[in-house]
Swiss-Prot record:
Keyword annotations of the record: Bacterial flagellum, Cell outer membrane, Lipoprotein, Membrane, Palmitate, Signal
Protein name, as recorded: Flagellar L-ring protein
Stated family: Belongs to the FlgH family.
Subcellular location: Cell outer membrane; Bacterial flagellum basal body
Lipid bilayer topology: Lipid-anchor
Length: 230
């Protein structure tokens, strides 16, 4: 019965990994990166008469900034992400224990075990551990993506989100971005760099044959997973 339970557990784990591989990302599958469209005003609201000469609903400003500031406006983000991380760890432990017991005297004479053997003896214990670890990681992401303003917060900051898909031969490459933007950080040409976005979520990946070639199969992921004994 135990062997049957183990076999069923392994099969269920394999199926989970397999299902994950069968559902790669697709355009529009995540609402967190879906575009936001401008809200069309209700004609009934525009026809309301308040008695004043000026109406904010039908006002046409003479001068207006081209920067994104309303839900549905488009903002271009230049990706300049670069991270360099390096970590070194060295551990050395050493312990030496030495114990010496001298022969005792009895009636002024050393105690003997016979045949000339003395009770003098030494105990020497040495333990040593050396450990060393090193990790180096470099990441760089450059490019651009246009996103839309999803929401304007009470303090004027804007929540932006969007994705870009590019099909190259037999595969797709995508960039997804979401975060919070300050209006002061938007340049005059309606662009902003990714390092000025708060709470940024940037994803870059791909689907297709090339991406599948660079990924491990479901059985390899099980064998190299943390649950498999080394």
């Amino acid at each position: 019965m135990n062997r049957l339970n183990i076999a069923v557990s392994c099969l269920a784990t394999a199926l989970l990994f397999g299902c994950e591989a069968l559902h790669p990302p697709a355009p529009g599958d995540n609402p967190d990166y879906a575009p936001t469209y401008p809200v069309t005003p209700d004609p009934k609201e525009l026809r309301k008469v308040s008695g004043a000469i000026y109406s904010s609903e039908t006002a046409l400003p003479l001068f207006e900034t081209p920067r994104a500031r309303h839900p549905g406006d488009i903002l271009t983000v230049f990706l300049i992400e670069k991270t360099d991380a390096q970590k070194n760890a060295t551990t050395t432990q050493r312990k030496n224990d030495t114990t010496k017991i001298t022969n005792k005297l009895f009636l002024g004479r050393p105690i003997s075990l016979g045949s000339g053997y003395s009770m003098d003896f030494d105990l020497d214990n040495q333990r040593q551990f050396n450990g060393e670890g090193r990790s180096i990681q470099n990441n760089k992401l450059a490019g651009s993506i246009s996103v839309t303003v999803a929401k304007v917060l009470a303090n004027g900051n804007m929540v932006v989100q969007g994705e870009k898909w590019v099909r190259i031969n037999q595969g797709n490459e995508f960039v997804r971005l979401s975060g919070i933007v300050r209006p002061q950080d938007i340049k005059a040409d309606n662009t902003i760099t990714s390092d000025r976005i708060a709470n940024a979520r940037i994803s870059y990946g791909g689907t297709g044959q090339i991406n599948n070639t660079n990924a491990q199969g479901w059985l390899s992921r099980i064998l190299w997973g943390p649950l498999f004994p080394t």
